A protein has these predicted regions:
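C-terminal beta-strand-rich structural cap/linker in extracellular carbohydrate-active enzymes
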Residues: 381-403
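Glycan-recognition surfaces
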Residues: 130, 177-279, 300
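Structural recognition of the beta-strand scaffold that forms the well-ordered cores
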Residues: 24, 28-34, 63-70, 109-114, ...
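Aromatic-lined carbohydrate-binding/catalytic grooves of carbohydrate-active enzymes
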Residues: 50, 54-155
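Bacterial Sec-dependent N-terminal signal peptides
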Residues: 1-20
Length: 403
């Protein structure tokens, strides 16, 4: 009898800790977010235009599903009677529900933003003290994604704050992807898998490849390669339904074509969420080609869900590997220098053994066809050593297809 009671108590306890919807992010989420390009300068017209462009550009067809409206969508004060958040009536004259219905009619999903503190980062009403009320409000709108930031939190405990919001969303019974955006300050990779589907592993990204950049107000963003360096060691914490997030994409926002290609390639290698942040209504053919490269995206979305890693680094040229579900491998050679760099990689002399996934690449016992992910060229097999020149701040990204 005591054993039965103990089992019942354990079952109740486990159920009480179930506080996120499973299966919403079996592969890294893909979509678009308004912040990088528009900050709080958002509107109903903009959102509809972005939704239309996600469809017409082919982004939806290759997997970009979530349209996320970041900071600035709400009025500066809550409803004086109900305490509810109020979508800004000037920015959204037909209301938020009608706009969400429009986005859903395009076959897309919709996300909103708020903050764990008393205010959002831009000074709009935060969620602190309103977690369950806001969760019910989001459920009534039918949103699919919530980005939850970390401004104006004072001495708030991060684990408790995000845990409370996660429980509130779960209680509201609307399946919503919960994106924890506390910048990696409190090591969310150690505790956030029970709360949400992705967590920021870095501070905010900027439009810069590497180095130290200062933006207005003295803000120092993380350049692309700093985000990479911070995120890469955390691979063991990532996997289906719980992803490391080194922040949104800056592809198309001002870096060079080579730097954009490197940025996208490494986000794909690291199984990072692919959340575009450019004005896709006006993107160039080059930007579109990078963001919609089906082979790179397939590497990112591989169902094995293993984050790739930096296998070797010599003279600022890095070699990355990522095991894939069907026995194939993704390989990326990254040139962090400002000069072209020649590489020569003898597959048979390298025994790539990934303890995390228990996958092994041994070209001495198996042969792989080599396909260049960006040029789409077939490049012989691993029976021969691989030679190439990697251009400055660029990559050579390969898929090894097992024979």
């Amino acid at each position: 009898m005591k054993k039965i009671i103990l089992l019942l108590l354990l079952a109740i306890n486990v159920k009480s800790f179930a506080q996120k919807f499973e299966g919403l992010a079996s592969t890294p989420p893909m979509g678009w977010n308004s912040w990088n390009t528009f900050q709080t300068n958002i509107s109903e017209e903009l959102v509809k235009g972005i939704a239309d462009s996600m469809v017409s550009s082919g982004m939806k067809d290759v997997g970009y599903t979530y349209l996320v409206l970041d900071d600035g969508w709400m009025a500066m004060e809550r409803d004086a009677t109900t305490g509810d958040l109020i979508p800004d009536p000037k920015k959204f004259p037909h209301g938020m529900k009608a706009l969400i219905d429009y986005v859903h009619s395009k076959g897309l999903k919709f996300g909103l933003y708020n903050c764990a503190g008393t205010k959002t980062c831009a000074g709009y009403p935060g969620t602190r003290g309103y977690e369950y009320q806001d969760a019910r409000f989001y459920a009534s709108l039918g949103i699919d994604y919530l980005k939850f930031d970390w401004c104006y939190t004072d001495s708030l405990n991060a684990q408790e704050a995000y845990g409370t919001m996660s429980k509130a969303l779960f209680t509201a019974k609307q399946p919503i992807i919960f994106s924890l955006c506390e910048w990696g300050s409190h090591q969310p990779w150690l505790w956030a898998a029970k709360d949400g589907q992705l967590w920021r592993s870095t501070g905010d990204i900027g439009i810069c490849y590497q180095g130290d950049t200062v933006i207005g107000g003295g803000w120092r963003p993380n350049c692309v390669m700093k985000c990479v360096d911070l995120n890469e060691p955390l691979r063991k914490y990532a996997g289906p339904n719980h992803w490391n997030d080194p922040d949104m994409l800056e592809v198309g926002n001002g870096m060079s074509e080579a730097e954009d290609r490197t940025h996208f390639s490494l986000w794909c290698m690291m199984a990072s969420p692919l959340i575009a942040g450019n004005d896709i209504r006006k993107m160039t053919a080059v930007t579109k080609a990078i963001l919609t490269n089906k082979d790179a995206i397939a590497i990112n979305q591989d169902v094995l869900g293993v984050q790739g890693w930096r296998y070797a680094s010599k003279d600022s040229v890095e070699t990355w590997f990522k095991p894939l579900n069907n026995g194939d491998w993704a390989v990326c050679f990254v040139n962090r220098t400002r000069q072209p760099q020649k590489i020569n990689f003898n597959w048979k002399k390298e025994n790539v053994n990934d303890e995390l996934s228990s996958k092994q690449l041994n070209a001495a016992t198996a042969t792989y066809k080599i396909m260049d992910v960006w040029t789409k060229k077939n490049l012989s097999t691993t029976a021969k050593a691989f030679s190439a020149t990697v251009q400055p701040h660029d990559v050579v990204m390969l898929q090894l297809i097992k024979q």
